[in-house]
Amino acid sequence: MNNIRTIKGGTKLKGKIKVPGDKSISHRALIIGSIAKGNTTIEGFLHSEDPLSTADCLRKLGVNIPKIIKDEPFTISGKGLDGLKEPKEILNCGNSGTTMRLLMGLLAAQEGKNFILTGDASLNERPMGRVGKPLSLMGGKISGREFGNKAPISINGEKLKGCVIGTPVASAQVKSAILLAGLNASGTTSVIEPASSRDHTERMLKAFGADISIRGELGRNIVITSGGNLIGQRILIPGDISSASFWMIAASIVPNSEVLIQNVGLNPTRTGILNVMDSMGCNYEILDKSTIAGEPIGSIKVKTSNNLRSFTVEGDILPKLIDEIPILTVAACFCSGVSEIKDAQELRVKETDRLKVMARQLQKFGAKITEKEDGLIINGQSKFHSAEVDSETDHRVAMSLAIASLLAKGTSKIMRAGAASVSYPTFWEELDKLTN
């Protein structure tokens, strides 16, 4: 994570690429495949640090997961809903909040078994009470530092009771943890969200045979009933639109660029980036649309756009593009007028405080950004000069700064550029490919 990358500004992007498998779906394929009956074969898995942390934890829970080799399919032998073993050691989730939060839900319902979850220094400072509190309403026994809000987290598996839970924030991780707990809870568990969040868990549980339904206004009420079994499936994981977004924005704002990104997941709970690109006036088209295992996919062709318009991101669209805010902040610097990010407090408790970090680092290039409690105000039509910037160990910051460097006059340095490997291990190779 400590390596340095140098990037020469003024370089156009040309070519076609495939982005790595979707990180969210990779986590869920491992977890749901592990508690299904029979075998689950996974293709297109994201071979990066976070999903590999999930695989390592599941192995310690007794799941037979082979060594995962990049770009090769593999098969999990599922243990069934109550077949996980009490581990002999602490489960280390690395830097992955998804791993920790989803496992909290899964393990809280493993009656009579005890577990301890920890992570790296960054993860152990991220809020976990947002998962622990709703699980406690179901009868879960979860404790941790700062009144259960921070890891290490201790879980005493219990027989949980289904209930109706309203989540204070639209979070796919919180929702997914409750649904996974609901698989082993008595009766019916209902999750009501304030806004729709990404729905990969619901789609995959349904594909595996769970009794799950989507109800209410805008699909914000998800109901799961226990009592059945999950049956192993063959899962083909599409490319991650959050990873594709770096190239989509880069091709839009770097002069004379044209990029085709193939086989990208187009789940409607994840395509907020396309809505913003429409508002900006970006020049793109979606090709080769299809649906695989309930997930819509397609290829996205993007060409440079002139006179991009400023935009505002706020409200219900935030959950659909929460991971794209860093690269959209870069885009805003090159739009006409003033753009604004609102209602984005969630970014302050990601791998870093992404609002603060993006403002601090882009200002080094000459960006005019004002930080607010819940977002950013970005003045457009910036003229970037070269700078030495730092990912501050955040993968999405590292990649966003790389794209920003292409717009800077001169050669820029990115410190701790290796952070990109958390979600996109081949990012730097792809950047070299598209710029040469």
UniProtKB/Swiss-Prot annotation:
Q: Which Pfam families match?
A: EPSP_synthase
Q: Which GO terms describe its cellular component?
A: cytoplasm
Keywords from UniProt, A to Z, are: Amino-acid biosynthesis, Aromatic amino acid biosynthesis, Cytoplasm, Transferase
Fetch the Gene3D superfamilies from UniProt: Enolpyruvate transferase domain
User: Could you name the active-site residues?
Assistant: 323 (proton acceptor)
Biological process terms in GO annotation: amino acid biosynthetic process; aromatic amino acid family biosynthetic process; chorismate biosynthetic process
Q: Which domain of life is it from?
A: Bacteria
Where is this protein localized, as stated in its record? Answer: Cytoplasm
Binding-site residues for phosphoenolpyruvate, renumbered to this chain: 23, 97, 126, 173, 354, 396
* Predominant location: cytoplasm
Residues reported in the UniProt entry to bind 3-phosphoshikimate? 23-24, 28, 171, 173, 323, 350
The keyword Transcription regulation belongs to this UniProt entry's keyword annotation = no
Q: In which pathway does it act?
A: Metabolic intermediate biosynthesis; chorismate biosynthesis; chorismate from D-erythrose 4-phosphate and phosphoenolpyruvate: step 6/7
- Reactions this protein catalyses: 3-phosphoshikimate + phosphoenolpyruvate = 5-O-(1-carboxyvinyl)-3-phosphoshikimate + phosphate
**Enzyme class, first EC level, given as a word:** transferase
A Gene Ontology MF term for this entry? Answer: 3-phosphoshikimate 1-carboxyvinyltransferase activity
Role noted for this protein: Catalyzes the transfer of the enolpyruvyl moiety of phosphoenolpyruvate (PEP) to the 5-hydroxyl of shikimate-3-phosphate (S3P) to produce enolpyruvyl shikimate-3-phosphate and inorganic phosphate.
HAMAP family (UniProt xref):
EPSP_synth
Q: Which family does it belong to?
A: Belongs to the EPSP synthase family.
The protein's name is: 3-phosphoshikimate 1-carboxyvinyltransferase
High-level lineage: Bacteria, Bacillati, Cyanobacteriota, Cyanophyceae, Synechococcales
